């Protein structure tokens, strides 16, 4: 049985890691053992942060909705309760955009929420 020399496969494996480590600083970009660890850690961060991004955007939307609601004399929780009672189903992303970019439309929603709370 002939001897198998693995130089080609080893080089291909290394090149794959170096391609993923492109743009890194110091030895992380050109020393295989360090680059491999850096790429693995980057993958862990990416996996974790794809989930955190969803939480962070929801937090941001809630902050913006709360600010817009308080400008119109209502807290976030009362505003959301009023919308639910008025059977207005708009998600937080759209509400946050309205609060920032279309204050008049958002003010109308706040008035409808106030009316639903009073009824």
Swiss-Prot record:
Gene3D superfamilies listed in its UniProt record = 6.10.160.10, Ribosomal protein L20 (1.10.1900.20)
Which InterPro entries does the entry mention?
A: Ribosomal_bL20, RIBOSOMAL_L20_CS, Ribosomal_protein_bL20_C
Q: Which ranges form a coiled coil?
A: none
Q: Which CDD domains match?
A: Ribosomal_L20
Signal sequence coordinates: none
GO MF annotations for this entry?
rRNA binding; structural constituent of ribosome
* Any single biological process term in GO: ribosomal large subunit assembly
Q: Which residues cross the membrane?
A: none
The record's Gene Ontology cellular component field reads: ribonucleoprotein complex; ribosome
State the UniProt keywords alphabetically. Ribonucleoprotein, Ribosomal protein, RNA-binding, rRNA-binding
**Sequence similarity:** Belongs to the bacterial ribosomal protein bL20 family.
Family annotation (NCBIfam families): rplT_bact (TIGR01032)
What's the stated role of this polypeptide?
A: Binds directly to 23S ribosomal RNA and is necessary for the in vitro assembly process of the 50S ribosomal subunit. It is not involved in the protein synthesizing functions of that subunit.
The molecule here is called Large ribosomal subunit protein bL20
Q: Which organism is it from?
A: Neisseria gonorrhoeae (strain ATCC 700825 / FA 1090)
The organism's taxonomy opens as: Bacteria, Pseudomonadati, Pseudomonadota, Betaproteobacteria, Neisseriales
């Amino acid at each position: 049985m002939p001897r198998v020399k693995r130089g080609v496969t080893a080089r291909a494996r290394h090149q794959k890691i170096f391609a993923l480590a492109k743009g890194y600083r110091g030895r992380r970009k050109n020393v295989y053992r360090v680059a491999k660890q850096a790429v693995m850690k980057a993958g862990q961060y990416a996996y974790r942060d794809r989930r955190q991004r969803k939480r962070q955007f929801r937090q941001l939307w809630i902050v913006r909705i709360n600010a817009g609601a308080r400008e119109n004399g209502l807290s976030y929780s009362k505003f959301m309760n009023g919308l639910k009672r008025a059977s207005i189903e708009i998600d937080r992303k759209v509400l946050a955009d309205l609060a920032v970019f279309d204050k008049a439309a958002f003010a109308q929603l706040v008035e409808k929420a106030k009316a639903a709370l009073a009824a």
